[in-house]
Design a protein with these regions (language model features):
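Nucleotide-activated chemistry modules centered on ATP-dependent adenylation/adenylyltransferase
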Residues: 1-227
Length: 227
């Protein structure tokens, strides 16, 4: 196993995740290699695109919106704010994908290069287990990195096993993070949770109001019948 995660922020989060995989590797007698934790290289590539995205969102007044979330569970529809904002949303979606692509590329190239240098014939990734990732981009970038390094690409879409993965990790007491890794994804995950929580609260309030209205109508109808 090769741990290439220069995207993870802050450093104590990186260390927590590394210690988790080290414990599992030790328990299963799997060899584990820690890659480079070069956060400067990450910021110069994926981070630069992420900053451009944040500036666009601020300028377009959509900083409180979730942009192009790969989450399979739909969010509440966005308010129509006209063609200018619609164009900004489209550009923001492109930038978010580009940011994640740059992140995948940096880490896969590092991994594939190590594999080629140390006699491994193929590289795969566990990123594809998450339905909250851009699986299509992961496959494209893994294939690209492997071709560049001269090793085989062993991509597998593990999303069908996501629920099993969650269940087993919980049974084993393995730490599970609630965001991908970078500081942008941390903020996006928090925003998405806030929006979903507000939507659930609004739905619950609407159902309660509807039940109350129905009960009042039923009571009024009963009173009218007795007059």
């Amino acid at each position: 196993m090769y741990f290439a995660n220069a995207n993870i922020h802050p450093q104590n989060e990186y260390e927590h995740r590394l210690e988790t995989i080290q414990a599992l590797a030790s328990e299963r007698a799997y060899p584990l290699i820690e890659g480079s934790y070069d956060t400067d290289a990450w910021e110069e590539t994926a981070g630069r695109i992420g900053q451009e995205l944040e500036e666009l969102r601020e300028g377009a007044g959509i900083a409180n919106e979730v942009v192009d979330s790969p989450n399979p569970y739909p969010l509440p529809p966005k308010e129509d704010k006209g063609p200018h904002v619609a164009a900004a949303r489209e550009k923001a979606a492109q930038l978010r994908r580009a940011r994640c692509r740059a992140c995948y590329r940096l880490r896969f190239e590092e991994t594939a290069h190590y594999a080629a240098e140390h006699g491994f014939d193929a590289v795969g990734t566990t990123l594809s287990v998450s339905p909250f990732q851009y699986t299509d981009i992961i496959e494209e970038e893994l294939l690209r990195a492997c071709k560049k390094a001269g090793v085989n690409c062993a991509f597998t879409d593990y999303r069908p096993y996501f629920e099993d993965n969650e269940r087993i990790s919980k049974e084993m007491g393995i730490y599970r993070q609630n965001f991908c890794g970078c500081h942008f994804s941390d903020e996006e995950a928090q925003l998405e949770r806030t929006i979903r929580k507000a939507a659930r609260k609004a739905k619950k309030a609407a159902l309660k109001a509807a039940k109350k209205e129905a009960a009042e109508k039923e009571l009024l109808g009963s009173i009218n019948e007795n007059l």
